Amino acid sequence: MIRRLFVFGLIALLVSGSALAEELPPLVRLHVVAEDDSEEAQALKKELRNVCLRCAEVCIGDAPDADAAYMRLQDHVQDFETACAARARELGYTGDISAETGSFGFPDRLYGDVLVPAGEYRALRITIGSGEGHNWWCVLYPTLCVINEEDAASGEIRYYSRVLEWLKARIGGVL
């Protein structure tokens, strides 16, 4: 009996996970990596995040799909690097800033009620200095970049369970 329940649970997990992944359109992500975990480095990371979001709005704001958005990022990657480096210099940072596009690994991330599963995604990555600090990421296309400093400051962590969501959908939210 326990073996059957385990097998059923495993199948449910796999089915629900693949169904969630199929519902998402192709994505293009942004990844900004701080030099280290000092207050100054983390503040610079947030400043450069803002620069990237403003540049992305102009660069890919009217892109018809993820492929077009990514191609525009590739065409303008040097512009992102230049804009970030200029802002960093204004703030007194003298280290290296690099920008690159490619396919990078990302962890699970919950944006409101939308779960973006872990995996390889096309992205623009901005690396500050050695890139050994905490990072910030979002979805540039379609836009899921939410900057909510109040939630971040609260330290509240929201947990998400695919199995629990699958069960809620079938039982009607009783759980």
Residue spans of the language-model regions?
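Soluble extracytoplasmic domains of inner/organellar membrane proteins
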Residues: 114-166
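Mid-length scaffold segments of soluble, non-membrane domains
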Residues: 70-123, 127, 131-133
